[in-house]
Amino acid sequence: MSRVGKLPVKIPEKVKVSVDGNVVKVEGPKGKMHFPTNPLVSVQVDKGEVKVARQDESHVAKGLHGLTRTLVKNALEGVVKGYEKGLEINGVGFKAEVKGKEIHFTLGFSHPVVFKLPDGVTAEVDAKQTKLTIRSVDKHLLGLTAAKVRALRPPEPYKGKGIKYADETIRRKEGKTGAA
């Protein structure tokens, strides 16, 4: 039995969970989301808890059992608290600016870089325009969006210029030394 999957997930107050076939729908104070589940796994809602069970004992079903339970837990936590990820922009003249559903970056290229935010994701920049905070109720979409933003200008190892996660440490390299 999956040690993660067998644990029931408690439904917080002000959250509504429904299962429609293979689609789990979650609504809460911060927003709503839905995601599909695999037919090898069944999801039931009863007495303020969500329980996940697998249909057979195959290796694939065992893996999907724990995954589905974690996806349900993340969805419940997301619609109540929400998720956020911080990014830092390092480099001379590097900055970001949020305009509606777009982030405009100045990253040392000959042109500004425009990044369109997906639905359900919001962003804000601090006063210095070097710290970017991305928020969403969907943990997966948040991580994907943060990775795409970081990929616009990944940090380089010599001076550390680029976009990095707030909690990321860049392994620095030493530059060339002159011939003796």
Swiss-Prot record:
Entries under InterPro entries matching the protein: Ribosomal_uL6-like (IPR000702), Ribosomal_uL6-like_a/b-dom_sf (IPR036789), Ribosomal_uL6_a/b-dom (IPR020040), Ribosomal_uL6_bac-type (IPR019906), Ribosomal_uL6_CS (IPR002358)
Cross-referenced SUPFAM superfamilies: Ribosomal protein L6
The protein here is known as Large ribosomal subunit protein uL6
- Similarity remark: Belongs to the universal ribosomal protein uL6 family.
Q: Which GO terms describe its biological process?
A: cytoplasmic translation
Q: Which Pfam families match?
A: Ribosomal_L6
Record key words, sorted: Ribonucleoprotein, Ribosomal protein, RNA-binding, rRNA-binding
Q: Transmembrane stretches, by residue range?
A: none
GO molecular function ontology, one term from the record: rRNA binding
Single GO cellular component term: cytosolic large ribosomal subunit
Positions the record marks as coiled coil are: none
Instruction: Give me the gene this protein comes from.
Output: rplF
HAMAP family given for it?
Answer: Ribosomal_uL6_B
Q: What function does this protein fulfil?
A: This protein binds to the 23S rRNA, and is important in its secondary structure. It is located near the subunit interface in the base of the L7/L12 stalk, and near the tRNA binding site of the peptidyltransferase center.
**Quaternary structure and interacting proteins, as annotated:** Part of the 50S ribosomal subunit.
**Is Ribosomal protein set as a keyword in this record?**
yes
* Listed PROSITE patterns: RIBOSOMAL_L6_1 (PS00525)
